[in-house]
Amino acid sequence: MNIKDIGVIIAKKTLKENTFIITVFTKNHGLYSGVVKEFSKKSKFIYQEGNIIDFLWQARLHEHIGMAKCELIKSYTGYFITNKAKLYAFNSVISLIKELFHEREEHSKFFSFLINYLDNLSKNFCFRDYINFELALLAETGYKLDLTKCGVSHVTTDLIYVSPKSARALSYAVGKPYKDKLLMLPRFLLSDNSEITLEEKRQALALTNYFFNRYLFHNNRQVEARQTFIEYTLNNF
């Protein structure tokens, strides 16, 4: 059977000399892995993580790993390789997708979101965009946070906390008696114009990390590329 789609290469693993297994996040078919062969400098340039490609997958049976052929649409490597913030954010993003999405499970809307994120990242690293990516990823996997209004009083102002149980924002008045049991809601997530402090970065990463650990990172197993991004971000403010 054949599958033809557009995709982003998110992993590449050596099988033997000049032969690799690539994992591609495709628009209409989700994650697919296939064997590719590199025999030229051109093909080595095509099969790089982050490249947007035309992806052709062929196998006798659907459950087989299959062979893959790719044509390059766009490469982001040059934009990320010389900037650590961009590179670590990129590595974290593709590693999270590989870790949290199941093989051959469609995420077409999220694919478009990813392409837009990579395009913006190629121009400029923005911490707000990165956290919004993690929040979107949580939502895509079934764990959406509601930060638009208080989960109890429904007010839309003075939102300070997030409930770890309901994943909803809480106002200062509602949350104050329970503040030691609540997560902090970073101010920058409520306003596109506010500057982001180091403390708010810590709060934002703690927020998404809590829900990743609770629902998605089994046995509290962390994604190494994400940890590298966090360490770099918090130590290079």
Curated annotation (Swiss-Prot):
An example Gene Ontology cellular component term from the record? bacterial nucleoid
Q: Which Pfam families match?
A: RecO_C, RecO_N
Keyword annotations of the record: DNA damage, DNA recombination, DNA repair
Mind telling me which InterPro entries this protein's record contains? Answer: ARFGAP/RecO, DNA_rep/recomb_RecO_N, RecO, RecO_C
SUPFAM superfamilies according to UniProt = ArfGap/RecO-like zinc finger (SSF57863)
Q: Does the keyword DNA damage apply?
A: yes
Q: Which GO terms describe its biological process?
A: DNA recombination; double-strand break repair
**Per the similarity annotation, which family is this?**
Belongs to the RecO family.
> What does the UniProt record say this protein does?
Involved in DNA repair and RecF pathway recombination.
HAMAP family annotated for this entry?
Answer: RecO
Q: Give the protein name, as stated in the record.
A: DNA repair protein RecO
The gene name reads recO
